[in-house]
From Swiss-Prot:
PANTHER family: 54S RIBOSOMAL PROTEIN L1, MITOCHONDRIAL, LARGE RIBOSOMAL SUBUNIT PROTEIN UL1M. Part of the 50S ribosomal subunit. CDD domains: Ribosomal_L1 (cd00403). The lineage of its organism: Bacteria, Pseudomonadati, Pseudomonadota, Gammaproteobacteria, Vibrionales. It comes from Photobacterium profundum (strain SS9). It holds the Pfam family Ribosomal_L1. This is Large ribosomal subunit protein uL1. Binds directly to 23S rRNA. The L1 stalk is quite mobile in the ribosome, and is involved in E site tRNA release. Protein L1 is also a translational repressor protein, it controls the translation of the L11 operon by binding to its mRNA. The gene is rplA.
Amino acid sequence: MAKITKRMRVIRDKVDATKSYDINEAVVLLKELATAKFVESVDVAINLGIDARKSDQNVRGATVLPHGTGRDIRVAVFTQGANAEAAKEAGADLIGMDDLADQVKKGIMDFDVVIASPDAMRVVGQLGTILGPRGLMPNPKVGTVTPNVAQAVKNAKAGQVRYRNDKNGIIHTTIGKVDFDAAQLKENLESLLVALKKSKPSSAKGIFIKKISISTTMGAGVSLDQGTLEASI
């Protein structure tokens, strides 16, 4: 039997696994339990009423959170010419074509998001086996393959989150840091839920958002009472 640590025991005693918490109450609880020596992220798991085995019911997209994620995002852009200048002005950290691809092939990947203009996909396409498994491959469905690379860079820097359901129909993403206040986390979560509802597949029937849980990087999940969010979603 696995040993129960002091931290796990505290979490078990504090979190009622049978209860759905008010969003504000949940945030207070997460802050109380966040005792790691770094500022933990606040992550969300959203169970969707979809059949993930059916391709037409899979959900994928991106949205900019009103208060960002609290992370300093490094952005790499594959583009050239006027788009390269626009990306630089927008705040891109790395810009290039074949030269940038060579860095990636060598394992030099000091970035969190990759954006590409359509004409650059001939170069980026060669990097699929490297970028794909890391979730970094640009995709038009989430706005990272676009002729407007400057806006994509701004979105990434502003706190855009990308989401995609897993094989169990669950969305996992971040909505901020534990040092955000409750109002900021609530507004970020509601913004994500609005985007998700807009992404609901037409073939998905019944309740779409079935369960929402939030947790910190090192903490347990706390189930939310959706009634405390209904005004916005």
